[in-house]
Amino acid sequence: MPQNPERTVDHVDLFKQPEYTELFENKRKNFEGAHPPEEVERVSEWTKSWDYREKNFAREALTVNPAKGCQPVGAMFAALGFEGTLPFVQGSQGCVAYFRTHLSRHYKEPCSAVSSSMTEDAAVFGGLNNMIEGMQVSYQLYKPKMIAVCTTCMAEVIGDDLGAFITNSKNAGSIPQDFPVPFAHTPSFVGSHITGYDNMMKGILSNLTEGKKKATSNGKINFIPGFDTYVGNNRELKRMMGVMGVDYTILSDSSDYFDSPNMGEYEMYPGGTKLEDAADSINAKATVALQAYTTPKTREYIKTQWKQETQVLRPFGVKGTDEFLTAVSELTGKAIPEELEIERGRLVDAITDSYAWIHGKKFAIYGDPDLIISITSFLLEMGAEPVHILCNNGDDTFKKEMEAILAASPFGKEAKVWIQKDLWHFRSLLFTEPVDFFIGNSYGKYLWRDTSIPMVRIGYPLFDRHHLHRYSTLGYQGGLNILNWVVNTLLDEMDRSTNITGKTDISFDLIR
């Protein structure tokens, strides 16, 4: 079909045209050596069986779609939440292009980071010269206020010593001696993106706060969001603390960086936590982490080196937000204002409106440990019944915490927690023990296609939908958003399953 410049056909419609369908069929028949359709269908059906599930869960040396990213992604994300900070990755350009692209495709925003451009020679002899030259170019060309260094597999395998390399770069005159260059070793072959976040956060805080301890507290509360990719959450946190009159510092605030306005002029480093505020965080009254499993090393460092009180509070749903606000009130002496109590009432009222559609519904969820705990806890409040909980980057500590939450609810008795399993395992679970809906990131759309189970997109990354990252998921307002996504996904599916005229449309109701 010839294209008309007045109406260009996009790929969705273009590849449905007869010439393309014929092309694809000939390609399969003459060049791919494909199995007959009947055999493909037979094997496909077998992969949905209990027999295949047992074989699937017995595999040891293969991972299929792991539902996690590698350490440098988390390290870059943590660094970009600080004012004027340029992530510098000691490794190859291809790896850094992946990290940047992964974040850019989620946020639909540019993501600035540089690479030391290590190639074959650096893989053998080390990347010292790459760093010396890269530091000079980065400092002079991009004019950052801080450069945060992390590593890829190549640099870790050869054993690059970041601390020594940075010192040599300063001695060589690439950057000033007093210029802040925190670093973190982030090997991609261990841990995940949440490990990289923790390593970089500890590296940045230890660098900026060195020698800044004072005899008296500044009276502030530090908040560490963790690997939380919803920019609306930091804004909601700031709004709630503003309403309470709490003096605070968010350690790594990337909300303006990944949701910057289009004002007609390019700004390379929008927003971020002020470096002087981060440096003074050592003198705060307490530090509250909103995620536990993205901050273990950072919290241990703050507790032992800063001698500062640390807490983990997850302000999700009614109960979680209640506990968070109560704890902040006790730490600061500030009362919880009526405005937030009214918001709580709105969430309770909304739950009452939608409760009947969620209560008793079985669901499955995969994602990062803290996200799973927060979302599952909120859904348990509404009587939803988890069946499959899968966390590839979860550990035994997470499993015990999650199982304790499930055991404390009458709706969590049938759930099973799977750690260090991937999305191909999740597929077997959905086929052998179906649920009413499942929750996950964009990679779950292939499971939605295979199983026809309704999917609620919550998590990271969200590549195939726009603007979801702008919403909040924490606090009472965030609870409304989660409730909205879940209940309306269920109602959409109800309409789809009752839309056949004269057969199922007796329940195709106008009012739900």
Curated annotation (Swiss-Prot):
Binds 1 [8Fe-7S] cluster per heterodimer. It comes from the Bacteria. Its cofactor is [8Fe-7S] cluster. InterPro entries: ChlB/BchB/BchZ, Nase/OxRdtase_comp1, Nase_comp1_CS, Nase_Mo-Fe_CF_bsu, Nase_Mo-Fe_CF_bsu_N. It catalyses: N2 + 8 reduced [2Fe-2S]-[ferredoxin] + 16 ATP + 16 H2O = H2 + 8 oxidized [2Fe-2S]-[ferredoxin] + 2 NH4(+) + 16 ADP + 16 phosphate + 6 H(+). Tetramer of two alpha and two beta chains. Forms complex with the iron protein (nitrogenase component 2). Pfam families: DUF3364, Oxidored_nitro. Its EC number is 1.18.6.1. Keywords: ATP-binding, Iron, Iron-sulfur, Metal-binding, Nitrogen fixation, Nucleotide-binding, Oxidoreductase. One of its GO terms (cellular component) is molybdenum-iron nitrogenase complex. The lineage of its organism: Bacteria, Bacillati, Cyanobacteriota, Cyanophyceae, Nostocales. CDD domains: Nitrogenase_MoFe_beta (cd01974). Belongs to the NifD/NifK/NifE/NifN family. GO terms for biological process: nitrogen fixation. This is Nitrogenase molybdenum-iron protein beta chain. It comes from Nostoc sp. (strain PCC 7120 / SAG 25.82 / UTEX 2576). This molybdenum-iron protein is part of the nitrogenase complex that catalyzes the key enzymatic reactions in nitrogen fixation. The keyword Transferase does not apply.
